[in-house]
Amino acid sequence: MTYNPRIGGFTHVKQASFDVHVKRSEARPRTSFAQQIKRIFSKIGETLGQLFRHRAPDGAPGRVKLQGVRYVGSYRPTGDARQAIRHFVDEAVKQVAHARTPEIRQDAEFGRQVYEATLCAIFSEAKDRFCMDPATRAGNVRPAFIAALGDAARATGLPGADKQGVFTPSGAGTNPLYTEIRLRADTLMGAELAARPEYRELQSYARQQAIDLVANALPGERSNTLAEFRQTVQTLEATYRRAAQDASRDEKGAANAADGA
């Protein structure tokens, strides 16, 4: 698949063999990260367009309507809303894995782009999660966390730049496969379930499933790097959250001492 600037999209190009494809992609200049993300979403858009234009194949999950505490339709669990929504998220993950795993493994350039986009998504989500939490305001913990997070991202080999002494990946954002999973899940479950609060609560689960999907499709070295980065980010979050708690206690202690003086 080749980007055509005249039409603002991608066209299919026959390749003689996988080896030839790899050599050609190695010879091409490295595109900007924004262009890479555009290519990934273009692929996803083509697939989702087909999904919306055609009926679901036999055996695919039917849409579900709420009737009290039970759900009607085929190929679905009965019970509470959370159980039903989890079912459709899992089904969406299976469909995306079926569609994208061969592409990630066979298209070297696409696989690299998805890999880097997933690392950037982990970085962005961790930064937002930590810095938007009121519990991390105390002390000077947030800048220290961002600096440590940037060092961890740099160690993966991600493209990026130093901004005021802190490394920032050049393509921070949302995992494109998570976006595809969510859109597919929306289609499978229908508007009524998609509007329920249980669906929003399961988005963290869907994000983790998207990362697992990419990790399982990548070659061993990149899969290991992805797993190590996830673990490093979790460790950093736990460490700096404890530091924020300690700083908050110290500030409260100092304030109480001043009041008692």
Curated annotation (Swiss-Prot):
Residues 241-261 are annotated as: Disordered. One of its GO terms (molecular function) is GTPase activator activity. It comes from Burkholderia thailandensis (strain ATCC 700388 / DSM 13276 / CCUG 48851 / CIP 106301 / E264). It is found in: Secreted. Residues 241-253 have a biased composition (Basic and acidic residues). Belongs to the GEF (guanine exchange factor) SopE family. It holds the Pfam family SopE_GEF. Monomer. Interacts with human CDC42. Keywords: GTPase activation, Guanine-nucleotide releasing factor, Secreted, Virulence. GO terms for biological process: actin cytoskeleton organization. The keyword Secreted applies. InterPro entries: SopE, SopE-like_GEF_dom_sf, SopE_GEF_dom. GO terms for cellular component: extracellular region. Activator for both CDC42 and RAC1 by directly interacting with these Rho GTPases and acting as a guanine nucleotide exchange factor (GEF). This activation results in actin cytoskeleton rearrangements and stimulates membrane ruffling, thus promoting bacterial entry into non-phagocytic cells. The lineage of its organism: Bacteria, Pseudomonadati, Pseudomonadota, Betaproteobacteria, Burkholderiales. This is Guanine nucleotide exchange factor BopE.
